Amino acid sequence: MRKFMKGCAITALLFILLGLILGVSGSLGNGSTHFSLGEFLSAVTLGRISEEKVDDWNDGVTEQIRENIGDVHYDLEDNVDYDSDYEVKSGRIELYVLGDDSQGITDLQVQVGGCVMKIQVSEDNCFRVEADGMRKFQGYVEGGTIEIRGTSKASNNSEGNLGGSICLYVPEGYYFENTSLDLGAGSLSVEELQTGTLEANVGAGKMTFEKLDADQAELDCGAGQMTVEELSSRVAEVSVGMGSVRLNGDVTERLDGECSMGELKLTLAGTQTDFNYDLSCGMGELKVGDDSYNGLAQEKQINNNASKNMELECAMGSVVVEFK
C-alpha cells in the first residue's frame, strides 16, 4: 500500500511538472515560437541541465517509439493454448456431449477470443458444447477438467452473427472446484456459476455473470467490461486497468479492489459500517457510502470493529461503493 501511494505521488508530480512546462513554454512562445524540451529546461535551471543532453535523450526516446509502434500486434491466438493431443476443429461444430455429472468433473477452464461465448444451464445432467463460425476450436475433458478453447475472426456464421459463437451447457446447480475464464476480444456471458475458486480475466472484451457463487473470486479487467449482476462470495479480489467493472452482491469476509484508470462500482449487501477499511487514493475519485476521498495521495484506515474488511486502491480512475 505504501508503494502504491508513493507511486501515485510521483505520477502526480510528473503530471504537474509536465503541465507547468507546457504552460510556461506556451506562454513564452506566445503561440508562434517553438521551444524544445532541452531549451526550456536549460533556461529554467540556469544551465544546470544541459540542453544538448536533454534533446538527445528526447530524440532517442521518440525514435524508439516510432521504430517499435509498428511492432505492436495483438493476436488472439497468441493467448489461447491449443493442445496438440486433441483435434482442432473449425467452422460449425454440431452439439455434442462432453460428459455428465457422474463422471467426476471438477474444474472448468475457458480460453476464448474474438467470439461470442455463452455458458448456459443444461436441460439434463449432461455437459454439452456447440460452436459456429470458429477459426479454431477445442472442447474436451481431461483429468476431470472441461477445456474450452477457441478463436474466430470477423465473419458471418450460419446464423448471420458477426464472428464465431460457442455455447457450453452445464447441469443446473453444478459445483466446480476451480474455474478459470480467460477472454480476449468478444464477449462471454454466464447464466449461473457455482465454484470454489474463480479466476476471470477480460482483455478488451465484455464478460457478464447473471449469478455467481464463489468462495474466492479473482476478477481482472484490462480495457474491457465486466458485470456481475448477483454475487455471493467469501473473498473477492477485483482489479481494473482502463476498463470498467460493476459488481452487485454479498461479500462475507474480505473485498480487495484496485483501479488504475478505469471505473469500479460496487453495490454491496449490508451497511457501510459492516466493514473495516484500508483506503488509498492517488489522483482519482474514491467514494464509500456517504464518504468521499478525493485529492492527491490520500490514505485512510477505518476500524468499525467489523467482521469484514475492505481494501481499496484508486490511482487515476473512479471507485464507488454503495450499500443496499
Label for each model-derived stretch:
Residues G7, Q103, Y174, E191-Q194, ...:
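Generic hydrophobic alpha-helical membrane-segment signal
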